[in-house]
Amino acid sequence: MAKKMPDIGEYKYGFHDKDVSIFRSERGLTKEIVEEISRMKEEPQWMLDFRLKSLEHFYNMPMPQWGGDLNSLNFDEITYYVKPSERSERSWDEVPEEIKQTFDKLGIPEAEQKYLAGVSAQYESEVVYHNMKEDLEAQGIVFKDTDSALKENEDIFREHWAKVIPPTDNKFAALNSAVWSGGSFIYVPKGVKVETPLQAYFRINSENMGQFERTLIIVDEEASVHYVEGCTAPVYTTNSLHSAVVEIIVKKGGYCRYTTIQNWANNVYNLVTKRTVCEENATMEWIDGNIGSKLTMKYPACILKGEGARGMTLSIALAGKGQHQDAGAKMIHLAPNTSSTIVSKSISKQGGKVTYRGIVHFGRKAEGARSNIECDTLIMDNKSTSDTIPYNEILNDNISLEHEAKVSKVSEEQLFYLMSRGISEEEATEMIVMGFIEPFTKELPMEYAVEMNRLIKFEMEGSIG
């Protein structure tokens, strides 16, 4: 018997709690609000100057004229800063009760106890809970919310801040630079390998809320780390904005994997800038899952600056009714013998739209560089659409570039075979979809793979007929 298609109100993470914030800025973006954010955070003068300069860039830069439809995004209707509690806690018991109940519903304390080396939980504009295992601290690993790192690790913080993504990069990077709050700061010392993942969880609770976390990760020579972030928000009738910036520096021989499982509600604009600089023989892997949001525009980038540097992006995007996933990757080869891989898996259903948008650049010094791109799309019905928009720029003849794109529908032969074995059409379709995304889920830690499969199954309910 076919399952009932879930109503939007049944979205598991769509609950919202009463407002328990201790401060909320006026709606709209002004110099006074930026100054107020900086004053409340007791920031050094250089950070206030950085914010105000970024605000000027934001005002002066045009909106993107490509990608998704941003016409319904009204910057004057957004609340840019909501402070949910007095401070970030290291004991779960000390987190304010209403906020703790939200994260309890999302399974955060349980996840930490089971398999995480460290956890950070951000609610609205601030990190409300942060903890890391003591043995990692003893190795010199720094894992803090970004605001604390600015105060406690200012020298290394300032050395790398906004060096990978300056405020002039794009309008939303400028916006983030002006009003950023929260996020994660990670430093892994030379030769130290973090064996279990560090996680951050980002939650929007308020209506018309903007969340602008800023994450900075520095992986020193021959060090390694795996960082995982998850995102959810309540279902509202008005729009919210998530506009993060993620900067990563991977030094000689270092390794970083950054895993995202984004499950924002369908009223959230998810407009994110993520970029890594990889030095000699460094490796960066983006594992990027996009299930929710009204519109996602996200293209994780690797600047392969050192000889032998490697970059990989493995992404999945699922778009249903009223959704547009405009996602992809950028690989910038600047040195000899660099290599990159892009694997993009997209599913569109019930009139959803998926777009792969990618750039691969081979600079003049990229002798012997190589890149492989695979784009696979599964279209579930005649109402849904898919576009593939690759852009390749080649300034060196001695390179290798392979690009394969494939668009398919659920095969009648596959369905017939499975249904002839007593499997319902809905279950058969679900099995085909699970097989399609398996290259992505097998790269996730086990607990995340289970959750990802559950999310996909939930999204696929009601897709038949």
From Swiss-Prot:
Pfam families membership: SUFBD_core, SufBD_N
BP-aspect Gene Ontology terms: iron-sulfur cluster assembly
Assembly information from the UniProt record: Part of the SufBCD complex that contains SufB, SufC and SufD.
Record function comment: The SufBCD complex acts synergistically with SufE to stimulate the cysteine desulfurase activity of SufS. The SufBCD complex contributes to the assembly or repair of oxygen-labile iron-sulfur clusters under oxidative stress. May facilitate iron uptake from extracellular iron chelators under iron limitation.
Stated family: Belongs to the iron-sulfur cluster assembly SufBD family.
PANTHER family found in the cross-reference section: FES CLUSTER ASSEMBLY PROTEIN SUF, UPF0051 PROTEIN ABCI8, CHLOROPLASTIC-RELATED
Protein name per Swiss-Prot or TrEMBL: Iron-sulfur cluster assembly protein SufB
